[in-house]
Curated annotation (Swiss-Prot):
Residue numbers binding CTP: 8, 11, 91, 137, 140
Source organism of the structure: Shigella dysenteriae serotype 1 (strain Sd197)
Domain of life from the UniProt record: Bacteria
Notes concerning its domains: Comprises two domains: an N-terminal domain containing the nucleotidyltransferase activity and a C-terminal HD domain associated with both phosphodiesterase and phosphatase activities.
Molecular function in Gene Ontology: ATP binding; CCA tRNA nucleotidyltransferase activity; cyclic-nucleotide phosphodiesterase activity; magnesium ion binding; phosphatase activity; tRNA binding
NCBIfam families associated with the record: PRK10885.1
Gene: cca
Assembly with partners or alone: Monomer. Can also form homodimers and oligomers.
Protein name: Multifunctional CCA protein
Cofactor binding note: Magnesium is required for nucleotidyltransferase activity. Nickel for phosphatase activity.
Catalysed transformations (reactions): a tRNA precursor + 2 CTP + ATP = a tRNA with a 3' CCA end + 3 diphosphate; a tRNA with a 3' CCA end + 2 CTP + ATP = a tRNA with a 3' CCACCA end + 3 diphosphate
Positions with a binding annotation for ATP: 8, 11, 91, 137, 140
Residues that coordinate or bind Mg(2+): 21, 23
Length: 412
């Protein structure tokens, strides 16, 4: 029996990155030997065991053979005669097909070290094309390591295109697509994930609402980058700088979906694209089974982001109504989230990356004023039932009006 550290732990250690999880491969053993040594079996489809002390995963070396469609259509073979090289060959990328023995020596049968040094994401073997989930995984790795200037090998991108055109991605379940997307949204450069999907044709298959934005022009005065798809990825990049929250980043990604519905004869203007985009947000989220809380914020951002850009022109009643519409009284975090997504929208434009966004500050200040109006005073004044809500709203509007007169510049 020989045990090797494999995969991501070896890769990230070589890159000088923090190692989160460690996975091990056991060569020359059987399930019974593992059980006799005190390991606990957890794998159903193939033999995976938990270490009795560390609870880290130890998998028997195995091979995989394509036996059906999609990413689950594989037959696994695990036996003492499966070599380490056999096990590593089934992995997706060469940089993930590295192992380390107990002496610290790196075993590298597929030139993963060379690709690490050259910052290349390259598939190990043609078997890569048998698992459509790997298209998403490579896009996610490209986003995860974009700050280290990794790029996808030409032959790997070509294979990803072939897989997409062959319809392989249609076998992916919504849950797996969202899981990979959610992971990509946590990276430092989530926009790279969607750019890679577009480069291999997968964006049109998995995110047609986003793909439809490319080639749709916006007024050059407000959008020097002109192309709405490019603007969308720029805003996502900016959102990633402003907030680590997946819901803020996803909502920013979806903020302009309505522009994809504008008839070409009306280009480059997109009047009413915000409310129009709400249905597309719902459609995308329903298809991918996006969690409700993330979906709800994306809907609100699509509907109201342009309203916040015009904040100095909003009257106090409209401002308080906005807080009602986003359910800020019960979910106050939405005010900050809306401020951040709107700021990402403004700064996600060519030449505006460092622009100030005072509307965000005014939105936050107006919220502090409105929510500081005490409900208790309204009740103590004798108002009852529906009158309480009406009087509370009136007082909030008055408070915001007083604040706006002093703090918010009047529109010219």
């Amino acid at each position: 029996m020989k045990i090797y550290l494999v995969g991501g732990a070896v890769r990230d250690a070589l890159l000088g990155l923090p190692v989160k999880d460690r996975d091990w491969v056991v060569v020359g053993s059987t399930p019974q030997e593992m059980l006799d040594a005190g390991y606990h079996q957890v794998g159903r489809d193939f033999p995976v065991f938990l270490h009795p002390q560390t609870h880290e995963e130890y998998a028997l070396a195995r091979t995989e053979r394509k036996s059906g469609s999609g990413y689950t259509g594989f037959t696994c073979y695990a036996a003492p005669d499966v070599t380490l090289e056999d096990d590593l060959k089934r992995r997706d990328l060469t940089i993930n097909a590295l192992a380390q023995d107990d002496n610290g020596e790196i075993i590298d049968p597929y030139n993963g070290l060379g690709d690490l040094q050259n910052r290349l994401l390259r598939h190990v073997s043609p078997a890569f094309g048998e698992d459509p989930l790997r298209v998403l995984r490579v896009a996610r790795f490209a986003a995860r390591y974009a700050h280290l200037v990794f790029r996808i090998a030409d032959e790997t991108l070509t294979l990803m295109r072939e897989m997409t055109h062959a319809g392989e991605l249609e076998h992916l379940t919504p849950e797996r697509v969202w899981k990979e997307t959610e992971s990509a949204l946590t990276t430092r450069n989530p926009q790279v994930f969607f750019q890679v999907l577009r480069d291999c044709g997968a964006l049109r298959v998995l995110f047609p609402e986003i793909d439809a934005l490319f080639g749709v022009p916006a007024p050059a005065k407000w959008h020097p980058e002109i192309d709405t798809g490019i603007h969308t990825l720029m805003t996502l990049s900016m959102a990633a700088m402003l907030s680590p929250q997946v819901d803020v980043r996803f909502a920013t990604l979806c903020h302009d979906l309505g522009k994809g519905l504008t008839p070409p004869e009306l280009w480059p203007r997109h009047h009413g694209h915000g409310p129009a985009g709400v249905k597309l947000v719902e459609q995308l989220c329903q298809r991918l089974r996006v969690p409700n809380e993330i979906r709800d914020l994306a809907r609100l951002v699509a509907e109201f982001h342009d309203l916040i850009h015009t904040f100095p022109m909003l009257n106090p009643k409209t401002i308080v109504k906005l807080f009602d519409s986003i359910d800020a009284w019960r979910k106050p975090q939405r005010v900050e989230q809306l401020a951040l997504t709107s700021e990402a929208d403004v700064r996600g434009r060519t030449g505006f990356e460092s622009a100030d966004y005072p509307q965000g500050r005014w939105l936050r200040e107006a919220w502090e004023v409105a929510q500081s109006v005490p409900t208790k005073a309204v009740v103590e004044a004798g108002f009852k039932g529906v009158e309480i809500r009406e009087e509370l709203t009136r007082r909030r509007i008055a408070a915001v009006a007083s604040w706006k007169e002093q703090r918010c510049p009047k529109p010219e």
